[in-house]
Structure formats: structure tokens, C-alpha cells
Amino acid sequence: MSHWFFIINPTAGHRNGLRVWKSIQKELIKRKVEHRSFLTEHPGHAEVLARQISTIQEYKLKRLIVIGGDGTMHEVVNGLKDVDDIELSFVPAGAYNDFSRGFSIKKIDLIQEIKKVKRPLTRTFHLGSVNFLQDKSQILYFMNHIGIGFDAYVNKKAMEFPLRRVFLFLRLRFLVYPLSHLHASATFKPFTLACTTEDETREFHDVWFAVVSNHPFYGGGMKAAPLANPREKTFDIVIVENQPFLKKYWLLCLMAFGKHTKMDGVTMFKAKDITFYTKDKIPFHADGEIMGTTPFRLASSPSPLRIKT
């Protein structure tokens, strides 16, 4: 068995990442699998580690296993974006795990491979790339989705929450997001969004949020784009506009089951290349991580990423 490298986020999923790693490490030692492991110490560290690992005797680096949440995997693919011959594996240990849902990845897959109970399959899919129009040299990649508008605004408010450190110290992290959501609901203003695709430019008014999805799942399992397929080189775009306050929450309830697609004010279409423009700078996130503001362009990655499951 070839040399394996691990990047582990020990704090993912309320320290579930560390527990998962210890169980895997036990099997690796038992089966005498040659490996090296690296634990992240702060946000952004997984990207740095991935970039550093890719320079360590590249002939050895054929397999990289990531243990953590969607944010950890997001950092790693951005650290390895110039390396085409590496096979990635993912062991879900986070809170949302949309990536593992979208690709039917289970925690037990790697353990079964180590025990030689299961023979792994290698699948390919195309990442999405974000090009910032203000700085065309800056490019980032995403695996799951892009969110523009309200949900990104909530995430931003959660990061800026005035008493965030106090709540974390008191182990009241679970209250930060709901309180930020309430504040965002009272202060967020819908916006006008222009979308330019390969064929046309469309304009949407009174927009609450827009989602660009690489697979069906969003926000911890909601089926925002039920027909999205990560093996296609197209994105599924969902735009929600003209929603009264209460109806917006009913829409989110239906979205949990993928039943929102025919509601008034919901527009869905596919595109390979799309640029978003707004009059004001509207925040957006990639895979749940706040990345910047509009305008920006999305396209499919030129070469596919290989995932071993």
C-alpha cells in the first residue's frame, strides 16, 4: 500500500474530527500502513498544510485523506488546486457534511478499505472556480455550492457577532447562529441581481438569495438543487425573489425536501459559465466560508478532481 498522508481537523464537529482520526489511526497501526498525519491548528491551516504537503517528494504523494468538515475539504482543494495526479479521500466529521452527502461518502468507507473489506472506487468531478472581477489574478475553488445574499449575510453576522468570544468561552456556540439569524432578518435588504451566462443576461429583482450548486445538498442536507449532478460540467442555479417574510421560511421548510422548485418566486436554470452583478456589494460564501462580495464569475475547473471512496 502506498504512502498515505492525512490532514485532520481535530475540532470539526465539536471535536468529532479527533475521535474519528483516533479510530482510523488505530487501524493504520494495526495493519502497518505507512502514513504521515498533520493536524490543523487554526482556520486556513488545512490549505497551508495541503500546499506544503504537495511539495514533499511528490512521487510519494499519491493519496491524501482529509478528516473534517466541508470547510476543511474546501481549504485542502484550494491548497492542492495545481496538483492533478493526487487522489483525495474524505472522511466526514463535521456538522453539515454536504460534500459527503453529495458524493455518498460514509465514515466507514476508509476503515473498510484499510481492513481490505472493501475495494475503493475512484470517481471524478469538476470543481467550480470563482474569479473575482476586481482582482482577476485571485481564483478560488469550491466543491459544494456558492450562496449569495441572505445566507451569506447571516454567516457574516455570525462571524461579527459582538459577544462571540464570550459565547464560545461559555460553551454557548449553538446560540450564535440563531441570534445572528434574527438580527440578519431584521436588517437584510433584498437586492437586484443580474446574471450573465453564455447565452443571455437576466435580471432578478427583490432577491433574497441565490445558490449555485454542484450537487443537490445545501446547508446541512437541504435539497436546494435536487437535480444537480457533480459529474456534469454545469452548475444548477437557484434564485429566490419576491418572498414575503413568512413565506420565505415556508420555502426553506420545503427546500429541506426539494419541494420548493415550483413555488412562485423561485427560478432554476443550468449554466457552465455565469457572472453575477449587483448595484451594491453583496456578500457571498463558498462551501459555507465567507469569501467576498459581488461581482464575480463562476466557471467549471479545467481538469477534474479524483475522489477515492
UniProtKB/Swiss-Prot annotation:
Q: Where does Mg(2+) bind?
A: 229, 232, 234
**Where, in this chain's numbering, is ATP bound?**
9-13, 40, 69-75
Q: Which UniProt keywords apply?
A: ATP-binding, Kinase, Lipid biosynthesis, Lipid metabolism, Magnesium, Metal-binding, Nucleotide-binding, Phospholipid biosynthesis, Phospholipid metabolism, Transferase
Keyword Kinase listed? The answer is yes
The active site of this protein is located at: 289
Q: Sorted alphabetically, which PROSITE patterns does this protein's record hold?
A: DAGK
Classification via Pfam families: DAGK_cat (PF00781), YegS_C (PF19279)
Would you indicate the residue range of the signal peptide? none
Q: Name one GO molecular function term.
A: ATP binding
Q: How is the cofactor bound?
A: Binds 1 Mg(2+) ion per subunit. This ion appears to have a structural role and is required for catalytic activity.
Q: Which InterPro entries match?
A: ATP-NAD_kinase_N, Diacylglycerol/lipid_kinase, Diacylglycerol_kinase_cat_dom, Lipid_Phosphate_FormReg, NAD/diacylglycerol_kinase_sf, YegS/DAGK_C
Q: Where are the transmembrane segments?
A: none
* Cofactor list: Mg(2+)
Family assignment from sequence similarity: Belongs to the diacylglycerol/lipid kinase family.
Query: What does it do?
Result: May catalyze the ATP-dependent phosphorylation of lipids other than diacylglycerol (DAG). In fact, is not able to exhibit diacylglycerol kinase activity in vitro.
* Name of protein: Putative lipid kinase YtlR
Q: Which gene is this protein's source?
A: ytlR
